[in-house]
Amino acid sequence: MGSPSLYSARKTALALAVALSFAWQAPVFAHGGEAHMVPMDKTLKEFGADVQWDDYAQIFTLIKDGAYVKVKPGAQTAIVNGQPLALQVPVVMKDNKAWVSDTFINDVFQSGLDQTFQVEKRPHPLNALTADEIKQAVEIVKASADFKPNTRFTEISLLPPDKEAVWAFALENKPVDQPRKADVIMLDGKHIIEAVVDLQNNKLLSWQPIKDAHGMVLLDDFASVQNIINNSEEFAAAVKKRGITDTKKVITTPLTVGYFDGKDGLKQDARLLKVISYLDVGDGNYWAHPIENLVAVVDLEQKKIVKIEEGPVVPVPMTARPFDGRDRVAPAVKPMQIIEPEGKNYTITGDMIHWRNWDFHLSMNSRVGPMISTVTYNDNGTKRKVMYEGSLGGMIVPYGDPDIGWYFKAYLDSGDYGMGTLTSPIARGKDAPSNAVLLNETIADYTGVPMEIPRAIAVFERYAGPEYKHQEMGQPNVSTERRELVVRWISTVGNYDYIFDWIFHENGTIGIDAGATGIEAVKGVKAKTMHDETAKDDTRYSMPHAPVRFTGRSLLNRFHYFCHALCWNNIFPIKNLSAQKDWTLTYPWCNSVIACYRRA
């Protein structure tokens, strides 16, 4: 699962480095020696803590993951999660600025009073590959005689041991007598290779070319496509027809070509991408300025445009629409704090999370994002197996327009682009509540180098409404609250930012919420309003509530279909999966359910 964002060694080292650079040699002593004092606000914010000052009470509140600290200037003790902690050096005020010793972070935040994070005594067999294991796997495959220098890596992940052995570990703490293995998927030009590596014995177990398949779109493919477009005279001539003379202002979006059985004139065995483009007009939102009816087909192996598909020229809509948020004025609201003054009600032990009666394992996959595994529920003392593994199985976003720039669009965001790789760091207090624990995750990039994603997953407990209430006449009121634990992850795929919540309820149910924010994809049209001559034809495939919007732009019909792969160990009814339509595909041999649902 990775490290807690605010407890990482890198953050600690950075904070201490900053602390030393701002050190104030004050006449304050610790254990008989002179203390090195550093600015509190700067040091703790670099470390990742939230610093608040109550001018009325003359007290600091420091919040970081599972630690809730109150400390007064000059006091010899701090209150950490409701428990007193003796300080080696008190907080000192000088020129209306708080100073702490350079040992303050270790003294307070690693005091042991925060019980959120526990040391893992025996690693869980489904723990994601560590950075060192990723490096080891890459070294082993690179040593193979079959490895070619320009080979890239699409996915490096754990090859899990037998399911029965994993359950025996989770339920009975039996050691798994199987070596750790890595599944390495590579891309050699257009050819896919899957290798299996034995990490314990440091050897290559298999090397298997995969036939009749296409590899994922990798991050460096985006740069390659942009470079090809920028240097193409043919493309420059095409955009010049649309009044664009500087191709460096053209932003490309490489898309998979789809499958049309050769009717589109494209070779199915070639590594091709269709490229649609937008104009950067300087408003921060190139999505609002589509270069319509122009599609470049790029061959990634030949590094060139092999075909340009054009329709009638449509003027690029130029009205500024800075929907990236820079023009948004936040409402003037008073601050809201969510605090847990005595610590968390859940613990994180390695990659295992325990909350109330729930226990589950959490890891990150570069393709599907978070993976929830070995889920159990304590049912009156009996630990029941609920789900072996659950994750996003995949998703597709088809657009309902047969025009030249749209008919092929049916994005397989997870399978084609890797939604785990496109994880968006979570902003505390904005994307997740301020009391959330934010976890870093490590995956491999396309070169096989370990890549840490900061604040990749948020874990938090929240109030979920009243559980029960009854007021009997003449008797005391009886009210109880409902709580739930949320695991949140956000992936940004192009213009959309998808937010996924796994929600664990006290009554033994699991919910999955999925939604999208970001910027809508629009089609450029000639009509400026619905009164224009071309409006009816321009909007024949548009959403009925927004046919022509924002002058020369139309919002097309599209759907977002989400599928989650849920490998249950007990078959429970799947209810209320979506507000529109849902269906399930059940696989009895592994008690697995692929649950699909859509959002317009």
Can you describe what each PLM-predicted range is?
Residues 59-62, 75-81, 184, 353, ...:
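Short polybasic amphipathic segments
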Residues 38-43, 99-100, 105, 137, ...:
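Short, structured motif recognition centered on aromatic/hydrophobic residues
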Residues 52, 62-66, 79, 118-244:
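Post-signal-peptide, soluble extracytosolic/periplasmic N-terminal scaffold domains
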Residues 72-78, 88-94, 198-202, 229, ...:
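A short, sequence-level motif marking secondary-structure junctions
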Residues 103, 107, 111-117, 187-202, ...:
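Hydrophobic, ordered structural segments
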Residues 33-38, 93-99, 173-179, 188, ...:
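Short, low-complexity cationic-aromatic patches
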Residues 2-11, 15-122:
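Primary recognition of N-terminal secretory signal peptides and signal-anchoring hydrophobic helices
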Residues 163, 215-600:
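Beta-strand/loop-rich accessory regions of lumenal/periplasmic or secreted enzymes
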